[in-house]
Amino acid sequence: MRIGIVVDSACDLPQDFIQRNNVIVLPISVRIGEAVLADHRDEEATLSFLHAHVAERGHEAETTPFSVNQIRDLFLQRLVIDYDHVFCLTISKLRSQIFDNATQASFAILNDYKPVRQAAGHTSPFALRVIDTLNLFAGQGITAVEAVRLRAQGLGVAPIRARLEQLAEHTYGYMIPRDLYYLRARARTKGDRSVGLIGAALGSALDIKPVLRAYRGVTEPVAKLKGFEPSAEKLFAFTVRKLREGLMTPTVCVGYGGELAELHALPGYAALQAACQTQGVELFESVMSLTGMVNVGKGALAVAFAAEPHSFSA
């Protein structure tokens, strides 16, 4: 059984992990003014687009997910030949059209795949499952890493699916934006009310940073802390505590809206790296996707893991 794993480009995982494990990426296109980039998780392209466009006018960006027809074409031209079963793991359907587009495309794919597969010499049926990760950005990485692990262990489709759906329900994505003015401007552009609890002007004047939590599809502020670096340090320390209590998978994903050297310099990050090593947990760090950066702003930090239900505490 050849199992394929598909994510969208909002999923924050390192480029080399994606390539090494043949994870297929559905690109999300980002347009700022006349500049357009289809995000294929290329960190250099993301950083150069960030420096050229996102920092100044990112809040005006329009993001366009892969359409129903584009998803259908990708599957019928390639994936129904290369794989027997595909898991398509998407960003929370409350944040994007991708889940709905992929679900709609799946009907056409399952209708039309037989002649394509037969021409390639495959007589067995093809199947796919679209799974809402119920999370975003670094949070999407948790289920994707586990899908790669379970596939490598040779597990069957049914236990993989059950495990991924269970994990999605237990994934926590924590995020600290650096610039509340940007976040408010972006929320206005999108008509998004999930960050409406933050008084942006007040927050920026006092250097208050919200800790946002994505969990079971909902994104909401769960704490207000003072200063970006102290807030990052508290989030890393909280993650270390959860690590020691025991996570549901040996995975922590970190996304940063800029150069990774800046992430490495944040207080508390070295302690998180050391704790991961001691506890046998893999730490995946990546430059945040372009989609992530235009939505939460340059220099934002996201940390995700799967754990039993809990509350955030600094």
UniProtKB/Swiss-Prot annotation:
Keywords: Lipid-binding. Hexadecanoate binds at residues 63, 96. InterPro entries: DegV, DegV_C, DegV_domain_contain. SUPFAM superfamilies: DAK1/DegV-like (SSF82549). GO terms for molecular function: lipid binding. The keyword Iron-sulfur does not apply. PROSITE patterns: DEGV (PS51482). Residues 3-307 form the DegV domain. The keyword Electron transport does not apply. NCBIfam families: DegV. PANTHER family: DEGV DOMAIN-CONTAINING PROTEIN DR_1986-RELATED, FATTY ACID-BINDING PROTEIN TM_1468. May bind long-chain fatty acids, such as palmitate, and may play a role in lipid transport or fatty acid metabolism. This is DegV domain-containing protein XCC3382. It comes from Xanthomonas campestris pv. campestris (strain ATCC 33913 / DSM 3586 / NCPPB 528 / LMG 568 / P 25). The lineage of its organism: Bacteria, Pseudomonadati, Pseudomonadota, Gammaproteobacteria, Lysobacterales.
